[in-house]
A protein has these predicted regions:
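Generic recognition of flexible, low-complexity loop/linker segments
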Residues: 218-220, 230-231, 272-273, 293-294, ...
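Repeated scaffold domains used in trafficking and secretory/extracellular systems
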Residues: 78-81, 269-273, 336
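Short beta-strand micro-motifs enriched in acidic
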Residues: 28, 83-85, 224, 278, ...
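Structural motif
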Residues: 32, 89, 159, 228, ...
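Beta-rich carbohydrate-recognition and catalytic domains
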Residues: 1-21, 26-75, 84-146, 154-218, ...
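Extracellular glycan-associated modules
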Residues: 377-578
Length: 578
């Protein structure tokens, strides 16, 4: 079986001492990868945490021994990020806790540079951060500035840009706002004294919107083609946030929820939302597609979803998301603090689970898909094993064998119309004498209930509503999940697609070109299936439309694989088969 590049276990490990965070990679002028990261012998924020580098000459397959940017005997130093200027000089920018205040988020913004592609590093320099209201009102009265940085600096018109949050309470992280650090003359500076640093926006108050709560952190910035600065960050509102600046960072729009191209808000827990611009001018957005409002648990950061962005009229149109990475074990720590790498037409992503970090080659067809969603309109035939219709109430027909869900998957696609949405009325079932298969029934609030079983009592993760993953485990013979409330209407022909991805163990629904995300009534629209799900085929493999089904299935297709979101969208745009 071909390796699934989305499975993080197939990634290439990045070295560390034990704890490892923010593995960010730049391509140096010699073609090698220079990875900077925060590491330490213990866990996060413990003694001897420091910033290091490592070099790969084979695109992440192997790495050099760790190179100290700061020694572990120095005051705690963290959250290193990197950028390379055209001359080849590499900069490492990080938080250095020189005053010894007991917080991993306290200290100066420091940087060093390397003129030999990361092998050796200069003395330490300081970025002067302007003292503002958030600093003066912090728990140290401004004597220490509390902040950190997850951003990857970007270069534009000779300057460097990176976003940060300033924090009121140090480690507690319960009151923060966004700021932009801009360094002018950065690209051509021969000596750090030639760089002019600005803390923006102008004035005493940073970038935040109290309507979305007190948490506005982990800012990261990209520059649109005409110079608009686009900043994204995490919140505890269940949504990522964005703001834009048209005047080089001096003023900013009121931060708002990020939204898809059709205006629906995107969802993300309190986890790093990362935006990245490729050399083709298109964007990727890393997020988790659920709206759990707090820190979350292992599940809230697994899987990772990615949305493709297309620039239009000084804004970004974000497409429907795909699963980029997953851990097949949903009980372990999820992935976060990513970076994206582009070299010679190929793409990679890095991530960390705090005790292990990896790099991952990205399937180029996945990126082509997310970047072309708005134009794709060809019907996808690869994997079709059944294509027929129309079917009305009481119809029966034989279907092919579906793949085992132990690594395999399937997709059910229907063009379907309801004359009524009467609760408990059967729509379609494949369950026979052995009670294996799937069953679709009309449920309350214009939803459909999907049930699936392989005949065994299985445990599966219910919707994620607590900090303990085990608390969400349910034992049941029949897995079930519903479409979002009110996504279906009477008298309309819907494009309804059920995707069962047995590799990632994720089941999802799409209706009329939209990936259902739980809307306003649930934290998510996708759902885990059991890790051990296998054969759901009954002996006779007969599908039956409900005897009292109030409607018509104009066309039904089965695929012997999971379809990507982008493929489903292409089918939707292609329209109902003639």
């Amino acid at each position: 079986m071909t390796r699934d590049l989305r499975n993080i276990n197939y990634g290439a490990p990045i070295p560390s001492e034990n704890y490892v965070d923010q593995p960010y990679v730049v391509v140096t002028n010699d073609g090698n990868w220079l990875c900077v990261l925060t590491t330490g012998p213990g866990q996060e924020s413990q003694e001897n945490q420091h910033v290091v580098a490592s070099i790969s000459k084979d695109q992440g397959k192997t790495w050099s021994a760790l190179i100290d940017i700061e020694k572990s005997t120095e005051p705690i130093n963290s959250w290193v990020t990197a950028v390379v200027v055209p001359s080849g000089r590499a900069y490492a920018i990080y938080c250095y806790n020189q005053d010894g205040i007991s917080s991993m988020h306290g200290g100066i913004m420091a940087f060093r540079y390397s003129d030999d592609n990361g092998l050796t590093w200069s003395e330490r320099f300081q970025v002067p951060m302007r003292l503002t209201k958030k600093d003066r009102e912090n728990i140290e009265g401004g004597k220490t500035q509390f902040w950190w940085c997850i951003d990857k600096p970007v270069l534009y018109n000779g300057s460097v840009y990176l976003g940060i949050p300033k924090i009121h309470n140090g480690w507690r992280l319960d009151d923060d706002e966004g700021w932009l650090i801009r360094g002018d003359h950065f690209v051509d500076a021969q000596h750090p004294d030639e760089i002019t640093w600005h803390t923006l926006p102008d004035g005493d108050v940073g970038i935040f919107n109290p309507e979305l709560g007190l948490i506005h952190e982990e800012q990261n910035v990209e520059v649109l083609s005409e110079g608009t600065l686009y900043m994204v960050n995490r919140t505890v509102s269940g949504h990522p946030e964005f703001a834009t600046s048209k005047d080089n960072g001096h003023t900013w729009s009121k931060p708002a929820k990020m939204y898809y191209a059709d205006g629906r808000p995107m969802k993300n827990p309190r986890a790093c939302p990362r935006m990245w611009k490729a050399s083709n001018g298109k964007f990727l957005f890393w997020f988790h597609n659920n709206s759990y409002p707090g820190w979350g648990n292992a599940n809230n950061r697994n899987p990772v979803w990615v949305s493709g962005g297309i620039e239009k009229d000084g804004d970004i149109l974000w497409g429907e998301p795909e699963i980029l990475l997953y851990d097949p074990d949903p009980t372990v720590m999820g992935m976060s603090y990513p970076d994206f790498i582009e070299q010679n037409g190929h793409y990679w992503a890095t991530e960390t689970q705090k005790m292990v970090a990896r790099s991952h080659k990205i399937d180029p067809t996945l990126l082509v898909g997310v970047w072309n969603q708005f134009d794709a309109n060809r019907r996808v035939d690869n994997g079709v094993i059944f294509d027929a219709g129309p079917f009305s109430a009481g119809a029966t027909f034989e279907i092919p064998q579906l793949p085992s869900l132990n690594g395999g998957g399937f997709t059910l696609e229907m063009w379907i119309e309801f004359s009524a949405l009467w609760e408990d009325h059967p729509v379609l079932t494949t369950m026979g004498k052995r009670r294996k298969g799937f069953n679709i029934t009309i449920a309350p609030n214009h939803t459909l209930k999907f049930e699936m079983t392989d005949g065994q009592v299985r445990r599966w993760f219910d919707i994620l509503d607590g900090p303990n993953p085990a608390a969400s485990l349910k034992s049941t013979r029949i897995w079930n999940w519903t479409t979002d409330e009110w996504a279906l209407q009477c008298g309309k022909i819907h494009h309804l697609v059920w995707v069962v991805d047995g590799a990632s163990k994720v089941s999802s629904f799409m209706v009329d070109g939209k990936l259902l995300d739980g809307a306003t009534t649930r934290t998510q629209g996708w759902q885990w299936i059991n890790y051990y799900f296998e054969d759901i085929n009954d002996d006779d493999r007969i599908a039956k439309v409900g005897d009292r089904f109030p409607g018509k299935i104009y066309n039904l297709r089965l695929y012997n694989r999971y379809l990507r979101t982008s493929e489903v969208l292409s089918n939707y745009h292609a329209g109902l088969p003639k």
